[in-house]
Swiss-Prot record:
Residues 377-420 are cytoplasmic. Disulfide bonds join C62-C68, C66-C77, C298-C323, C300-C344. Keywords: Cell membrane, Disulfide bond, Glycoprotein, Leucine-rich repeat, Membrane, Phosphoprotein, Repeat, Signal, Transmembrane, Transmembrane helix. Glycans are attached at N81, N124, N275. It is found in: Cell membrane. The chain crosses the membrane at residues 356-376. Residues 283-346 form the LRRCT domain. This is Trophoblast glycoprotein. Highly glycosylated. Antigen 5T4 is overexpressed by a wide spectrum of cancers, including colorectal, ovarian and gastric, but with a limited normal tissue expression. Could be used for tumor immunotherapy. May function as an inhibitor of Wnt/beta-catenin signaling by indirectly interacting with LRP6 and blocking Wnt3a-dependent LRP6 internalization. Expressed by all types of trophoblasts as early as 9 weeks of development. Specific for trophoblastic cells except for amniotic epithelium. In adult tissues, the expression is limited to a few epithelial cell types but is found on a variety of carcinoma.
Amino acid sequence: MPGGCSRGPAAGDGRLRLARLALVLLGWVSSSSPTSSASSFSSSAPFLASAVSAQPPLPDQCPALCECSEAARTVKCVNRNLTEVPTDLPAYVRNLFLTGNQLAVLPAGAFARRPPLAELAALNLSGSRLDEVRAGAFEHLPSLRQLDLSHNPLADLSPFAFSGSNASVSAPSPLVELILNHIVPPEDERQNRSFEGMVVAALLAGRALQGLRRLELASNHFLYLPRDVLAQLPSLRHLDLSNNSLVSLTYVSFRNLTHLESLHLEDNALKVLHNGTLAELQGLPHIRVFLDNNPWVCDCHMADMVTWLKETEVVQGKDRLTCAYPEKMRNRVLLELNSADLDCDPILPPSLQTSYVFLGIVLALIGAIFLLVLYLNRKGIKKWMHNIRDACRDHMEGYHYRYEINADPRLTNLSSNSDV
């Protein structure tokens, strides 16, 4: 039945049968002893009623709005607009799906139950509009190995979300897979702090995730990875950083990730991989690297990477890698380039660059002073311009007068006679 509960063999049915059997026996005893039947029933009935009513919640009951399968050890509460984690989850649950809800906040001890959810191994909370995960939210889940928080706008992820409310005394987390794809919140909800830093703090707190084998951080608009972030995750086998905005891996060290098998760096903003990164990747024995759809800049700085690509086998689909810049190299396949193709525009020595910068500053100051002088003397300059204009006008009028006399012979003779 949609949205209903599909339960396995119910322990509650057994208890109900026992209660009915007790009532039948009580009735038989009452009928065999009529004088004491009324008093026996009146004294025993309250006890039986209280015994039945005092039974604790059945450990295999299915929460409202959820679907349960004891055989598969699975509970699904999907797209039910739940605002909190159900409190009556069955103790047998091993796989719990709480996707597509309206949880908003995951408080400390959100999954603490009596009896505890000791078998819960896989927890999926994706797409539940979580914007805050508090310290100790996943405490009391000793078997939790896979956690999916994808597609939640996590504006506030506590540093102790995965390590417990007190990382200094908490045991290592049992998590093996942590999926945090597309958890970046809107810009106006980031509380004026680095989103990358918030996520990394949660990953590294108390060194609780040293057993983590799979980490997915795709589609989070990461611009960089903080220094040594991966050094404290030595058990990683699969790392997904695809579809971010990473421009460089200069400060990221892969040296300690000796078990790393796959590294996804597709769809980032990488321009070149430098020698240090190339050497570390080449030193990992089982690594497969994915580098598709990055804007590679094919200039003289790309020479070492091109040489490495031609020799290594760790890069998957390396024949698909193409240049994005400069314009003359666009869509050229990296494996087809040689050293003659990779050149850089001449670069001025640093000392000469400094001289030109200083000269530009001096000229700018001189120009500013000149404009200030002109502004302060604007009235005098205006008067001087009027005088120049009047002088030019008088000069031109005299010129036109002489020209008219010279052009008319009668005026010329008249002028000569008047001179005589």
